[in-house]
């Protein structure tokens, strides 16, 4: 019932699962927005921005969820969304869209600077920039790029995105063994376990049953 009544963002690993969930929602008269490239920018990210701006429920993939930016964050903060994650999200990974040579070039030209304590990469050049490093600039401004040894570049999912949701439900198992559990602990995000009970085609959350966890 809460899935129907509340605005939600449902994130799934697979594109074909998006279509399957859309069909289920249609059959139950639940209106959802599926991001497409049918907009002026030809971008699914632009499409999900339109959905959030219009207070619509959304079904999308983990890949698209990873690309949410400050504009998406603003819309999420202004509306009361619930997040459903089908499996854990990739919250930390090596950033491979920039070569070490280009990274050193930006460092030497004083376009970026690495925080000596945290390792966070900051975009410090104040001039208006539009070029091949624009995506990297946006990530630096989000505060999600870190450097190890001035060469290895690490991307982290912006914790502000998770904090913008009223509630988050993660559908997975052995969560404590997942990187996202450590990520939540690092940011002092509290969570609790629940079990799922199913009967007559309906499923409800119940108190956590440890025997199901083993």
How would you describe each model-predicted region?
Residues 62-191:
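Signature of the SF2 helicase/ATPase Hel1-core->accessory helical subdomain module
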Residues 1-3, 159-161, 214:
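Conserved interdomain hinge at the start of the Helicase C-terminal
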Residues 5-7, 29, 54-55, 78-80, ...:
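A general structural motif
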Residues 3-29, 36-37, 63-64:
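Conserved Walker A/P-loop ATP-binding site and its immediately adjacent core
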Residues 28-67:
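Inter-Walker segment of RecA-like/P-loop motor cores
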Residues 16-21, 42, 177-179:
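Short, charged/polar "capping" segments at the starts of alpha-helices
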Residues 177-214:
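Interdomain hinge/linker at the junction between the two RecA-like core domains of SF2 helicases
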